[in-house]
Amino acid sequence: FPYTTLFRSEGIKQHAAHEAVTHHDVKAVEYYIDDQLDKAPAELTNINDALKTLVHFACTSEDINNLSIARCVKNAMENVWTPAFKEIIDHLAEKADQYRDKSLLSLTHGQPATPTTLGKELAVYVYRLGRQLKRIENQEYLGKINGATGTFGAHLAACPDVDWIAVSREFVTNRMGLTWNPLTTQIESHDWQAELYGTVAHANRIMHNLCVDVWMYISRGVFAQVPVKGATGSSTMPHKVNPIRFENAEANFEISCSLLDTLAATLVESRWQRDLTDSTTQRNIGSALGYSLLALTNLMGGLTSIHPNDAVIERELDENWEVLGEPIQTAMRACELKGLPGMDKPYEKVKELMRGHEISQDDVERFIDGLAFDAETAARLKALTPATYTGVAAKLVDFDR
C-alpha cells in the first residue's frame, strides 16, 4: 500500500482512535499498520499474520521516531531551507561584485568614518553566511536502531545468531541514508540536532543583522525602494513606502532563533536512559525552521526591491571631507619618521582642525600645503577625496567566497 493511500483523512481518524486508547503515538501507529495489513490484497493473505508479528519487532518507540525525525529534518534542510539560503547568498554575491567600486560613507558609532564600498560591505555578509553554509552542508544526521536502552537486548533474546550491530549499521546507513550512531541510551542523543539548530540560529542572526543594516541604509537614503504598484504603505499617509519585508524578516528570524535556541539547549539532556522532554520539544522543529524559511522569503523579496541611490551616496561623501583626517595624520607619522620638520603630534594637529568642524576640500588642501610634505606625498594626499579613499575595498570583494 502506498503511504498516501493508507494515511488520508480516514486513516488519520483511525490512528487518532487508537491513540485515544493507548496514549502512545508510536503504539497507535503500530496498531494502525496492523489494521491495514488485515485489509491487504488477497495475494498477501498467507503472510499477513507473520507481517503483523514483525511490526515493531524488538523496537522501542525512539527507534522509529529518531529515524523519522532525522530523515524529515535532512530532507527539509537539503531540499527546502538550504536552497533558499543559497539564493540569498548568491544574490548578495552578485550585488557585491556589481557594486564593488561604488564608494560609500562608513558610519562607526553612527558617525562619519573611513569610506568603504557598497560591494565590500555586502561581501562581508557573503563571507559570514558562506561559513555557516559550509557547516550546514557538512552536517551529519545521525540515527540509531538498537532497542530499549541501546543494547540490542531484545534482539539477541529472540535471534541470538544474528549480527544485530551489522544489521543496525546497514539499515541506518544504507536504507535510511543517515550516519549510524553506535552508542546511545534509549534515545539518539540529539547532539547533531543541537549542532544544526545552533548553526541555523547563527545564520539567522547574521541575516537579522543584514536586515537591520539594510533598513538603516534605506532610512538614510543610501538604498531606494521600488514601489509596488497598488501597494499601501500607510492607512493615512499616502506617500509611505515602508521597508516591511525587512521588518517581517527580522521578526521571523527572532522567533525562529528563540525556538532553535530552546531546541539546542533542551535536546542535549535526558534523564538517565531517557525521559519524554525531547519528544515534546521536537514537535517544534517544523515551526523553528518554518519561521526561518518565512524570514528568508521576506528577506529575498526585500533585497530584490532595492537599489543604490547614487545622489544620496555622492552627497554624503562630498559633505564629509573630515574623513580624510585619517590618511593625512598617518602620512604625517611616516614623514616624521623620515625626519621632515613640523610633523610632530600629527593626530593632535589634525584633530584640532577637523573635529567638530565642517570641513571642505579647500580646508583639506590648505592644511596639506601648510605642512612640509615632500612633493610626492603632498600630491598623493591632495588627490584623495572621500569617494576615492576606499583603500583596497573593491579588491577585497574577491575574497567573499
Predicted regions located by residue number:
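A helix-coil-helix interface module used to build multimeric assemblies
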Residues: 1-155, 159, 163-173, 233-234, ...
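A structural signal for small-residue-enriched, beta-sheet-centric alpha/beta enzyme cores
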Residues: 61, 156-160, 175, 180-187, ...
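Short, well-ordered beta-strand elements within core beta-sheets of diverse protein domains
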Residues: 76, 120, 194-202, 328-338
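Acidic, glycine-rich loop-and-beta core segments that form the ion-binding/anion-interacting portion
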Residues: 161-253, 257
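A structural signal for well-ordered alpha-helices, especially hydrophobic packing surfaces
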Residues: 30, 37, 41, 81, ...
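Glycine-rich cofactor/substrate-binding loops
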Residues: 18-23, 221-223, 234-401
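Hydrophobic stripe of amphipathic alpha-helices that form coiled-coil interfaces
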Residues: 40, 95, 99-102, 136-139, ...
